[in-house]
Every structure is written in structure tokens, then in C-alpha cells.
Amino acid sequence: KFKSVQSTNNKSIKLIQKFKYSSGLVVSEIQTKGKGTMGKKWISKKGNIFITIFFKVDFTKYNIKNFLIMNVKIIKKVLKRYTKKNIIIKKPNDLLIENKKICGILQEVIEYNNDKFLITGIGINTFVAPFNKKFIATCLCNHTKKIINNLEIIKNIKNVYEKMINDLNNNNFTYVKNKYI
């Protein structure tokens, strides 16, 4: 866990390259240069969740597009524990409540030492809805009667991903896809 990083995805890549980690979770209280899709900036407001999950993947066995679908559905399922409101997937990688963005997911693949890694950055507006002229955002605390605890949400996400990675290592992809999609 970090107080501040430029981006959790970039920090993950550095951990892979410097320490040769094969998987991990990077959490930061703030990102100074958060990344969105197509080179856009992710607006990172303190109090929200900024994490990246990374792990080694054999892409000869798995289709990268399936991971994006799984990632979005995993996070949607975790967030549904906290709200009765309908959470909609805005393809390819955003989650919306009442047509307002609550979560964005950035998926990248890097190659290092002949291994490929899936880097999945997740930004969730839990307490602060950032202002953006291009889209309207919301935050989870505006759509729930439950107490929001970022560490609990991160732990829930981590647990699901640990199970998924274990399933990937011990089962065929059809099994994993059926379980998580």
C-alpha cells in the first residue's frame, strides 16, 4: 500500500521489472497521473479506491478480451454487495449507476523476460465523485445505506482475484469463464 503513486498500473510494472513479482496487488491512496483508456487521464480524488492487480498469463491459452469482460463483471459483483441500485456496464470498461460513472477499469498487457502479464487498474469512486466535463460521475456512498469501508472493498476484490488466478492455474478457461462471466 502506498500513500501516493503516479499510477498504480505504472507502479505494478516497476514491481514486475525490479523485483520479478509474478503477481500482486498495488493500492494507493492517491494517483498523481492516473491513467484511463486511450491515453485519457483518470481523475483520482483522495478517499476513493485506486488499485492494480497483476499476474502472469499464458495468452496462448486465453483470449485477452475475455479478461476485460471478467474484470468488469467481478467488480460489478463486488459493488453490488453495497448497493441495491442497478449497476450498468458501459462497454468496454466502465460501471455506471444512474448513468453516472462509478468505476473505470484499465487493462494492459506487458511482456517481461518472455512472460506476459495482465495489468488491471481499477478506480472506484467510493466517497468523492470527481468533476469532469466529458462525463458525470457519482460515488458509491450516494447509493447505499451501508457503511463504506475502502479496505473491506479492496479485500473483497483481492479475494475474488486470488480465487480466479487459482482457478486459471488449475482449470481450463471454459470453467473460469463460466464461473466469472
Language-model features, listed with the residues they occupy:
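N-terminal lobe of the biotin/lipoate ligase/transferase fold
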Residues: 1-81, 85, 147
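Short loop/edge segments at beta-strand edges and connector loops
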Residues: 3, 89-91, 174
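Long, positively charged amphipathic alpha-helical accessory segments at protein N-termini or as interdomain linkers
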Residues: 59-87, 97-181
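Residue-level marker for buried hydrophobic side chains located in beta-strands
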Residues: 26, 91, 118-120
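Short, basic and Ser/Thr-rich N-terminal targeting/leader segments
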Residues: 20-22, 89-91, 100
